[in-house]
């Protein structure tokens, strides 16, 4: 009986041992490294998304901050995407996200390349032909289409697109092409260039409308593109309309709005406080000629401006406001009833008369001084409210009620610190 029991106990022990081995293999006491056997080695490439999120949200200091432009870290990712944080110096190739769909206000010297989805825009600009270089591009685009069924279709388009000598005749030629426009898909149906021909004819039919719109392209403003927070770049001055004012996207002053202790290198090294537009682009609206021509020497500003409403006898305490720290920003530490007067006066509550601090006068560049003297006390100049432009807590609805007399200049103040949606 003992001889028959021993193999049974051995079999039970073997089964228990095998089941224990199987369980130890199934439930890993030592978890494997993330990354499959034949896949990437355990390292950065095999981190899971959850691990990246945990690494990215370590109390605002993320271990993957240099990759947060690429979408790994979550803590500083929104700041990076909005251009509040400068790109890392160790990764200079990670530039600012200049989307192709970014809306520019088209001006004379600067033209972004047209989108591939908008091939009809180049022939669509008849008034811009004598000024711009895309005329040669349009001529090159149309030349391969001339041998096709194009000349019997459009008798006026060949001399129209061939050179700029016929450019003054475009408003006369374009209305004559309105009847043949529906026939373009019929004639060029089998042509591989049919969509381009149809779009050219369609844009030619809309030629007079675009020709009438040409003066709106040059209202006297110019656009200067810049990378986010190029700290070594000089202060740039651009004139844009109030619809296109994106605010200071990557300036250290805007970053100082979220973190009041951070003043930026330019301000601390040069001794300038927050009236300096260095470190970001400096745009002045030129919508109303009254606001541009009227400077600090010609009065407080345009009629009904917040500067006149923000007099010290209106209940404001200038002594209390002047006691603010120089690093205190108007968007963060202003009293709730003083939002508009404080923004119009500057970060410390003083009126922007001289406009630069006395200590900063020998250090300031002549262009910067000229801008200060010309546009110092104007509402449309984001000098003192450069920090407040980036303040997320303020909304345009909270700012409109305190200024009842500013119906003319209210849209400019309203749009001066709104981001342009891409």
UniProtKB/Swiss-Prot annotation:
**Has keyword Glycoprotein?**
yes
Q: Which UniProt keywords are given for this protein, alphabetically ordered?
A: Biomineralization, Extracellular matrix, Glycoprotein, Hydroxylation, Phosphoprotein, Secreted, Signal
One GO BP annotation here? biomineral tissue development
InterPro entries, from UniProt?
Answer: Amelin (IPR007798)
Q: Where is this region: Disordered?
A: 271-321
Listed GO MF terms = growth factor activity; structural constituent of tooth enamel
Q: Which residues carry this modification: Hydroxyproline?
A: 42
Q: Name one Pfam family in it.
A: Amelin
* Compartments where located: Secreted, Extracellular space, Extracellular matrix
- Spell out which residues are annotated as carrying Phosphoserine: 48
Task: Identify the glycosylated residues.
Answer: 117
Give the tissue specificity: Ameloblast-specific.
Q: Where is the signal peptide?
A: 1-26
Would the keyword rRNA-binding turn up in this protein's UniProt record?
no
Q: Which SMART domains match?
A: Amelin
Family that this chain belongs to: Belongs to the ameloblastin family.
Biological function: Involved in the mineralization and structural organization of enamel.
Name the chain's protein: Ameloblastin
Which gene underlies this protein? Ambn
């Amino acid at each position: 009986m003992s001889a028959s029991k021993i193999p049974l106990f051995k079999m039970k022990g073997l089964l228990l041992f095998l089941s224990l081995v199987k369980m130890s293999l199934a439930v890993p006491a030592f978890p494997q490294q993330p990354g499959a056997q034949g896949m990437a080695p355990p390292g950065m490439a095999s981190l899971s998304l959850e691990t990246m999120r945990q690494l990215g949200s370590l109390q605002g200091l993320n271990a993957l901050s240099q990759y947060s432009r690429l979408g790994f870290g979550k803590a500083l990712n929104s700041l990076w995407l909005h251009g509040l944080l400068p790109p890392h110096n160790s990764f200079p190739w990670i530039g600012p996200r200049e989307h192709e769909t970014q809306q520019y206000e088209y001006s004379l010297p600067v033209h972004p390349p047209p989108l591939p989805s908008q091939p009809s825009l180049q022939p669509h600009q008849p008034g811009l032909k004598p000024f711009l270089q895309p005329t040669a591009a349009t001529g090159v685009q149309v030349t391969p289409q001339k041998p096709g069924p194009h000349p019997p279709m459009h008798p006026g388009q060949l001399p129209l697109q061939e050179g700029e000598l016929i450019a003054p005749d475009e408003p006369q030629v374009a209305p004559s092409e309105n009847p043949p426009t529906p026939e373009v898909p019929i004639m060029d149906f089998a042509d591989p260039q049919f969509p381009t021909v149809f779009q050219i004819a369609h844009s030619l039919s809309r030629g007079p409308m675009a020709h009438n719109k040409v003066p709106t392209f040059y209202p006297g403003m110019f656009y200067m593109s810049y990378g986010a927070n190029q700290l070594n770049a000089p202060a740039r001055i651009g004139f844009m309309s109030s619809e296109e004012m994106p605010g200071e996207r990557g300036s250290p002053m805007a970053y100082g709005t979220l973190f009041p202790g951070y003043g930026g290198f330019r301000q601390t090294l040069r001794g300038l406080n927050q009236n300096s537009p260095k470190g970001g682009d400096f745009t002045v609206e030129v919508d109303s000629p009254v606001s541009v021509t009227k400077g600090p020497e010609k009065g407080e500003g345009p009629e009904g401006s917040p500067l006149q409403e923000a007099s010290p006898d209106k209940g404001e305490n200038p002594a209390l406001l002047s006691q603010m720290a120089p690093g205190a920003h108007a968007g963060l530490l202003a009293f709730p009833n003083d939002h508009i007067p404080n923004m119009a006066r500057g970060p410390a509550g003083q009126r922007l008369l001289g406009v630069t601090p006395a200590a900063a006068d020998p250090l300031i560049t002549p262009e910067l001084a000229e801008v200060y003297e010309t546009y110092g006390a104007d509402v449309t100049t984001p000098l003192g409210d450069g920090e407040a432009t980036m303040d997320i807590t303020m909304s345009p609805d909270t700012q409109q009620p305190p200024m009842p007399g500013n119906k003319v200049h209210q849209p400019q103040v309203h749009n001066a610190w709104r981001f342009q949606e891409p």
